[in-house]
Regions:
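Positively charged, small/polar-rich N-terminal and surface patches that mediate targeting and assembly
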Residues: 1-110
Length: 110
């Protein structure tokens, strides 16, 4: 079973929609962390931008769920267009212990 750690960084007002996309694909656990952009005040003012609050939404998904999530994020949130956020999938090559694997996959694979 291929597992991926999915991470999406986007504006906070999109966090609820991202979480809904993750849940619709059948992921069991979604973690949302609040953050802020890393640009300095000088950088923001030189480009005429305002500071934005961010949300980091993450989950663990199998290969099919990962494809569904990426497809839905492209269609609904236009995540593949610059300025709408960043989404990445990090492959999990090993998981220590059967219980951990069961927890991450909602006991579908132990």
């Amino acid at each position: 079973m291929e597992l991926y750690y999915l991470i999406t960084i986007s504006d906070r007002d999109r966090a609820e929609m991202l979480s809904a996309i993750y849940h619709a694909a059948g992921t069991g656990m979604v973690l949302t962390k609040l953050g802020r952009g890393t640009a300095t005040g000088e950088q923001l003012s030189s480009y005429g931008l305002d500071a934005t609050e961010k949300a980091v939404v993450s989950t663990v998904a199998d290969a099919e769920q990962t494809r569904q999530i990426f497809r839905a994020a492209k269609r609904k949130l236009f995540i593949d267009i610059p300025g709408n956020g960043v989404m990445m999938a990090i492959p999990l090559k090993s998981v220590a212990g059967g219980r951990t694997l069961g927890f991450l996959t909602d006991s579908t694979q132990t």
